[in-house]
């Protein structure tokens, strides 16, 4: 990776740490919004994928993946704070010694909690609105599926 790109990531890490320190409520709200968009994209992706399930499952999976990518675009366009993106940016900043590991931990924690809260709120609204059809299934599943690492990810085994 060119060093200029590393510098850009490092500067972004400094800006994220500064935003969290100076405006924690604003930063948390950005993380919640990222969680909202992830849930919206997940629901829409499932609808698109299930629409094609009986006729052409391969197209359903492809289109479902494309639709889910829209969430990432929305998150970038509104400047929301997605935990996975913060992992990349903050790690570069810490390795380049532009931010401390304590700042990295704070950004990761707040963005993770904000993403989870956003997922939880919109998932509950989705279920209480009766849109899920099976409230018991969706109540906790949506948030846990997209915010929690799997045991394989933690252990490193594949």
Name each model feature, range by range.
Residues 1-10:
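Short, charged cytosolic
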Residues 10-27, 98-99:
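Cytosolic juxtamembrane amphipathic/interface segments immediately preceding
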Residues 132-148:
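Membrane-interface interhelical connector segments
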